[in-house]
Regions:
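N-terminal Rossmann-like or analogous alpha/beta NTP/dinucleotide-binding catalytic cores
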Residues: 2-139, 296, 300
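Hydrophobic alpha-helical segments
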Residues: 6, 16, 25, 159, ...
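Structured ligand/cofactor/substrate-binding pocket environments in proteins
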Residues: 16-22, 40, 54-59, 78, ...
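Alpha-helical packing segments of well-folded alpha/beta enzyme cores
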Residues: 24, 28, 62, 66, ...
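Short amphipathic alpha-helical segments at helix-loop
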Residues: 51, 143, 147-150, 301, ...
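A short secondary-structure junction signal
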Residues: 109-110, 146-147, 206
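Conserved nucleotide- and phosphate/pyrophosphate-binding catalytic cores
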Residues: 163-340
């Protein structure tokens, strides 16, 4: 029986952080190890260029870092196909064909695109590549005939646009070549979106409010000790608020079942007074290090041979290109433009 296909990936614009880990990486490893799916994981460097075209050196450097992050959290190139988007030219060709099936007005109505345009402050200077990247995403997904795409709830419009393109193509060319994917959405969106250390709604590379998977223990300690807590909890004996307190929020997310009693007692103690922020932060540091130490150790080991890391990416890209090439051949056959 053929396994369902999952496609997922990241834009290589920097090292990955705990937000990526909680939001997607942990779940990818679980799905991979269930051995129920064919998993494709890609580094979306072409998509990253849509708003980093003049900073391509960042993307080049980030490819190696993101690949190390993938390997360190447990993504296994013998179980998942890990590849680089730009090394699959068939994706760009599929994008070109799909562009003829989508109106400019439809792209401009995409809520995700509208939100991101506003966030990035493009104004009237929107790069064409950025505006059409939902079509590029559709090419990525349909090239591998992905059945499932794990994304956040904010990406639902992108999945729907891919489904529309697949439907439109199949209807226009009287075929059933393209698969309409389904999104896999987090059951608890709050757990899947980790706030920044400063209390900002989202951990972000650009805001500098994150803990990176590659951070050493001393860096993690300094970041944890600077975390946002209750600004009114000035003295240890003062009652403190746990709502909006990032230390307790992180304890809820990263604590395991065996930590539940201790965390509950700390919350009660903090709220009645007598528990200082330093003590809660030290406990959080223990919890985080339990998670990060093995990741850091594996990352350092893989980083000793970057040549091998890039050979892994090359091998994965070659395997991915074979799959995408087959889909492209079917698409061209259906369109009547396979001449030889």
């Amino acid at each position: 029986m053929t396994k369902p296909i999952i496609l997922t990936g990241d834009r290589p614009t920097g090292k990955l952080h705990l937000g990526h880990y909680v939001g997607s990486l942990k779940n990818r490893v679980l799905l991979q190890n269930e051995d129920k799916y064919n998993m494709f994981v890609f580094l979306a460097d072409q998509q990253a260029l849509t708003d980093h075209a003049k900073e391509s050196e960042i993307i080049k450097e980030s490819i190696g870092n993101v690949a190390l992050d993938y390997l360190s959290v447990g993504l296994d190139p013998t179980k998942s196909t890990i590849f680089i988007q730009s090394q699959i030219p068939e994706l760009a060709e599929l994008t070109m064909y799909y562009m003829n099936l989508v109106s400019l007005a439809r792209l401009e109505r995409n809520p995700t695109v509208k939100t991101e345009i506003a966030q990035k402050g493009f104004g009237e200077s929107i790069p064409t590549g950025f505006l059409v990247y939902p079509i590029s995403q559709a090419a990525d997904i349909t090239a591998f005939k992905a059945n499932y795409v794990p994304v956040g709830n904010d990406q639902k419009p992108m999945i729907e646009q891919t489904r529309e393109i697949a439907r439109s193509f199949n209807h226009t060319y009287h075929c059933d070549i393209l698969v309409e994917p389904e999104g896999i959405y987090p059951e608890n969106e709050a757990a899947g979106r980790l706030p920044g250390l400063d209390g900002n709604a989202k951990m972000s590379k650009s805001l500098g409010n994150g803990i990176f998977l590659s951070d050493d223990e001393d860096t993690v300690r300094k970041k944890v000790m600077s975390m946002y807590t209750d600004p009114n909890h000035i003295r240890v004996e003062d009652p403190g608020q746990i709502e909006g307190n990032m230390v307790f929020h992180y304890l809820d997310i990263f604590g395991r079942k065996e930590d539940a009693t201790t965390i509950a007692e700390m919350k009660e103690h903090y709220q009645r007074g007598g528990l200082g922020d330093v003590k809660t932060k030290r406990y959080l540091l223990e919890i985080l290090e339990r998670e990060l130490a093995p990741i850091r150790e594996r990352r350092l080991e893989y980083a000793k041979d970057m040549g091998e890391v890039f050979r892994m990416l090359e091998k994965g890209s070659q395997a991915a290109r074979e799959v995408a090439g087959q889909t492209l051949a079917e698409v061209k056959e259906a369109m009547g433009i396979k001449y030889f």
